[in-house]
Amino acid sequence: MKFVDEVRIHVKAGDGGNGAVAWRREKFIPRGGPAGGDGGNGADVVLVVDPQLSTLLDYRYVREHRAKSGEHGQGSDMNGRDGEPLVLRVPPGTVVKDAATGELIADLGAADERLVVAKGGRGGLGNMNFATSTNQAPRYAEDGTLGEERDLVLELKLLADVGIVGYPNAGKSTLISRISRARPKIADYPFTTLVPNLGVVSWRERSFVVADIPGLIEGAHEGAGLGHQFLRHVERCRVLVHLVEGANPEEGRSPKADYEAINRELALYSPTLAEKPQILAVTKIDVPEARAAGEKLRKAFARRKQPVEVHLVSAVTGEGMPELMDAVGRALYAEAPRRGGRGRRLGKPRAEK
């Protein structure tokens, strides 16, 4: 399933209907008074959160959204009908911004939450409203006002419990395919994952949603690589699983350096990101050199002032996966580690500046 992260749409609320100029035309009443009805109010444009939606895909193809105008007033004191609100359904986690100013309008998360993004125009008054003792036959009525019109930017932040972060090609897509039924595109080159993938993991009698966040690189906080486009998805995750490649990293890189570089990017984008609980997983330990690098990293991180829980895993053989998922489940549901486990308490990593 493709996740559309950001779309720009144009919304136009309905105009108010015009008031009517009309007169009573009844038998035996030669000089009937004014009888022009009021115009109906224009329809609002309303965003409504729909928990059944998970993407903004529909708005990629239909970007113009116009609500109906109110009907004009009529004779015999008949008012025009109000326009029915135009409801645009969006998934939970949709952030609404003004396209012209960049101003944050709302962050929509709760099911059935409603937001009026364009207010309909007010209906005009008919001439019956303007009759006075000195002017009993007003020949004018009020026009309806125009409905609001604006451009909006909708951004989707995935609502996942756990975010899997790391350098491109660290094994994130392989991991999520191993622990859930998700089947992301996987290949041996960076940026295979161009959109976030979601998987549901069953843990004991509970479940949680995992998001495979596309690869981050140095400079991501400034938009490098796939930068800002994906860092926003990390913000709502409660726990981060940080993957580092144990075998064959590029020249000049190491598992420890990768870990610190990504945490630095998280901190530069938003200080609260680097403070989220993290579990570090060294991948590809089916390769001997990766296992050795992982053991070395585990010992080094155990000596830190704030120890970081380190797991050695292989998505190919499945080794270490149950222990990793157990650690994630405990972190989410604040359970104590099982007796005899090797895991250490979760640390909140500090990015090195």
Curated annotation (Swiss-Prot):
It is found in: Cytoplasm. Its EC number is 3.6.5.-. One of its GO terms (molecular function) is GTPase activity. Its cofactor is Mg(2+). An essential GTPase which binds GTP, GDP and possibly (p)ppGpp with moderate affinity, with high nucleotide exchange rates and a fairly low GTP hydrolysis rate. Plays a role in control of the cell cycle, stress response, ribosome biogenesis and in those bacteria that undergo differentiation, in morphogenesis control. NCBIfam families: Obg_CgtA, PRK12296.1, PRK12297.1, PRK12299.1. Monomer. HAMAP family: GTPase_Obg. This is GTPase Obg.
